[in-house]
């Protein structure tokens, strides 16, 4: 999915705020995904799934750090996430259907925590960005 110059501007504007608290926002998005879609827990057999779990927060930070890295390479998201794509496709074999579930929960968390910044243009841009990231992470599933 092609990101317009306007999309890139909105992504660049909101990502530093998200990245500054990656453990909190990423953890909340994962917690919501696990709660609403329990089948997604299968990839984390040793996790404590309680709200504000240190394990969920730590993994949430990894998710947000990867998104932040991708946001720094909006013209080459595939290149910036290539190793992560390999990991998810070949080693972890994560169900590709899980990426859109997490993307949805990230949007929910961002909307809740940044209501003034999360205007329709930012919503659209972040949705397109997350869809692009999901597509990149599943591109090697063949």
From Swiss-Prot:
PROSITE patterns in alphabetical order: GLOBIN (PS01033)
InterPro entries the record matches: Globin, Globin-like_sf, Globin/Proto, Hemoglobin_a-typ, Hemoglobin_oxygen_transport
GO cellular component entries: blood microparticle; haptoglobin-hemoglobin complex; hemoglobin complex
Cystine crosslinks: none
The protein's role, per its UniProt record: Involved in oxygen transport from the lung to the various peripheral tissues.
Similarity comment text for this entry: Belongs to the globin family.
Name recorded for this polypeptide: Hemoglobin subunit alpha-1
Organism expressing this protein natively: Xenopus borealis
């Amino acid at each position: 999915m092609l990101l317009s110059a306007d999309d890139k501007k909105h992504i660049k504007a909101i990502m530093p705020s998200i990245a500054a608290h990656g453990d909190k926002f990423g953890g909340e998005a994962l917690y919501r995904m696990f709660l609403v879609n329990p089948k997604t827990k299968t990839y984390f057999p040793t996790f404590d799934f309680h709200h504000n779990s240190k394990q969920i927060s730590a993994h949430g930070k990894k998710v947000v750090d990867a998104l932040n890295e991708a946001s720094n390479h909006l013209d080459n998201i595939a290149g910036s996430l290539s190793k992560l794509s390999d990991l998810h496709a070949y080693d972890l074999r994560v169900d590709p259907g899980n990426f859109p579930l997490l993307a949805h929960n990230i949007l929910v968390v961002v909307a809740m925590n940044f209501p003034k910044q999360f205007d329709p243009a930012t919503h659209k841009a972040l949705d397109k960005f997350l869809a692009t990231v999901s597509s990149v992470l599943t591109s090697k599933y063949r």
